[in-house]
Amino acid sequence: MSHELLRETPSQTAGPYVHIGLALAAAGNPTRDLEIWNRMAREDAPGQHILLLGHVYDGNGHLVRDSFLEFWQADSEGRYQERYDPEQPFNSFGRTATTFDAGEWTLHTVKPGVVRNAQGVPMAPHINMALFARGINIHLHTRLYFDDEAEANAACPVLNLIEQAPRRDTLVARRCEVNGQLAYRFDIRIQGDNETVFFDF
């Protein structure tokens, strides 16, 4: 039996409509009953609760105020949830968008535990990210690591695929405090000086 090979559908930039479909509150629309948004961990979720925040910059150093981000991470024990369930205290998947005024994104979660790669080698605690924004035809994949995990970062097999140390640093979020809460700042630079490392997954 022969199979017909179909051509890949061309990708398109996210454009101005991504918020209407996926970031309803940001677009000024009523939210759905089951909304996947920027609170991945409820207060009763085990682990160290953290706030992530940052900006997205284009190649000219200007804020990208209409970008959309998705996150996929392990829980505090290094386990991924296989399905989204609003009744459980933690979900591995979350979304957020930069605000139209300040251009800042935020995410409430717990610090992820250590996950092992396919060869069984432990990877440093990290959060997988996908960025959608105007002018980007195919969303960009990157990772967020933590600056207070220096020993784990130095041994991480994925982070060490990046040969130049300054390039590795573009994936490291900086510990800070926001209104008394432990937080990490992670700014994404799509192009230009200190461009964030993106992965071809």
Question: Where are the regions that the model predicts?
Answer:
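Beta-strand-dominated extracellular/periplasmic modules and repeats
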Residues: 1-201
